Every structure is written in structure tokens, then in C-alpha cells.
């Protein structure tokens, strides 16, 4: 995707972000129009599950009832004492100003 080597989306210079996502949009349309696909799933891995150490994305063609099960939720139920609000606060504190 980007010609300049970057590993993570957060490493991509801000001026290149629009071009990256315009390219993603073009690829998504081509996959959905060129293949028998009802839709698609767009996936970017950062470090974990990143197959190559270079920013790239996957456009996965999808069809209703295609059998692909992809769920980002937990493999177990959340505990009622889940620290979601504490995590949200830590993320808000780490979020850089726009």
C-alpha cells in the first residue's frame, strides 16, 4: 500500500492518510464489483497478526451465509466487574489532541 515504508497505521504521516484510504476505497469497490460479493470486510492488523511488517490492508469479499465467522468479541462472557470504564479513561488520557 504506502510506498514509503511504515509498519503501523499510526506511523503513516498525516498527509498520506487520505491517499491510503482512497486506495482502500478503490480496492473495496473493485473487489465487490469484480467478484461475486455482496460486500466486504476491510482489515488492518497492527503488530499482532500482521503477516508482513509493512502497513497494508486486507479486503475480504463477503457474501451472505458465506460461512466466514469473524467476531472481535471475547471468547467468553465479560465479567460483570469488567473494567471497561477504567480502560476507556486510560484510552482517553492517551489520545493525542487533534
Question: Language-model features: where?
Answer:
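HIT superfamily nucleotide-processing domains
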Residues: 1-98
Amino acid at each position: 500500500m504506502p510506498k514509503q515504508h511504515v509498519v503501523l497505521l499510526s506511523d503513516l504521516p498525516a498527509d498520506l492518510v487520505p491517499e491510503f484510504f482512497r486506495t482502500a476505497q478503490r480496492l473495496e469497490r473493485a473487489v465487490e464489483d469484480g467478484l461475486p460479493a455482496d460486500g466486504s470486510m476491510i482489515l488492518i492488523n497492527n503488530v499482532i497478526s500482521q503477516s508482513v511488517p509493512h502497513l497494508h490492508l486486507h479486503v475480504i469479499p463477503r457474501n451472505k451465509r458465506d460461512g466466514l465467522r469473524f467476531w472481535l468479541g471475547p471468547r467468553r462472557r465479560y465479567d460483570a466487574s469488567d473494567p471497561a470504564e477504567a480502560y476507556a479513561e486510560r484510552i482517553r488520557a492517551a489520545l493525542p489532541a487533534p
